[in-house]
Amino acid sequence: FTGIKGVGMTALALCAQDLGKKVSGSDTDEIFPTDKVLKQRKLKPKVGFKESNLPKKLDFLIHTGAHGGSTNLEVITAQKRGIPTLNLAQGLKLFTKDKQVIAVAGVGGKSTTSSMLAVLLDSAGLLPSFSVGVGSIKNLDAPGRFSKKSKFFVVEADEYVADPTADKTPRFHYLDPSIAILTNIEHDHPDVYPTIEDIFAAYKIFISNVPHNGAIIANIDNQGIKKFIKTIDKPVTTYGFSPQSDWQIT
């Protein structure tokens, strides 16, 4: 894992461990919120990015979009050796294959909502897999987990591009969610989305990946979402304080 200390990367590294894979990684020596959980899981990142960091036997390399993304020396070295390389979004797609994905998207509240969902499903005895962009989740003690016993996989779905250097695909376009939860939509990441209409277009593609027997759940209190759901042709279940919501918070 090149850039293993990033929150999304750590979550996937822990999923790989849960699958019984031998995991190694590299990153800078900066302090990260994932340092504690990596230490607990006996994952000691190598400092810096070097050819020698790559084990002789390597099934695949997953890399962050940071630290040069696909132009990182370790990624280039792996490719020269014929080792498959995946960016974080592609790696997440691999881990969520054959799972019932619950994807939480929005400009704000993604981490909190997906963490709450993971805790609730776990408390209900459903033992979900999850990948959330935080240092750790209270009561679960990790930002990521792969559960062979559960069909559910809770994912924080990010609208930013997968790899600024090589793959401008929004990360959440790689997902195939059974359930999509939209917390809010605002104009964000102007380097990628010049206008709010560009963001709406990205969310439309994300929503198009939800099957007709799936579910779209959205916060009707948010003006961006209120405008957005009028533009899609799939049923939406709404929640919020508004009397117009299907599930009203009182």
Predicted regions and their residues:
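Helix N-cap at the beta1-alpha1 junction of Rossmann-like dinucleotide-binding domains, i.e.
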Residues: G6, T28-F32, P243
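NAD(P)-binding Rossmann-fold cofactor-contacting core
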Residues: K21-V37, P128
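Phosphate-binding loop of NTP-binding sites
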Residues: C15-D18, K39, N53-K56, G69-A218, ...
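BRCT (BRCA1 C-terminal) domain core and associated BRCT-interaction motifs
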Residues: G48-G65
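N-terminal Rossmann-fold NAD(P) dinucleotide-binding loop
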Residues: M9
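Short acidic-hydrophobic, aromatic-tinged amphipathic segments that line or gate anion-handling sites
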Residues: P45-F49, L86
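Conserved N-terminal Rossmann-fold NAD(P)-binding element of oxidoreductases
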Residues: F1-I4
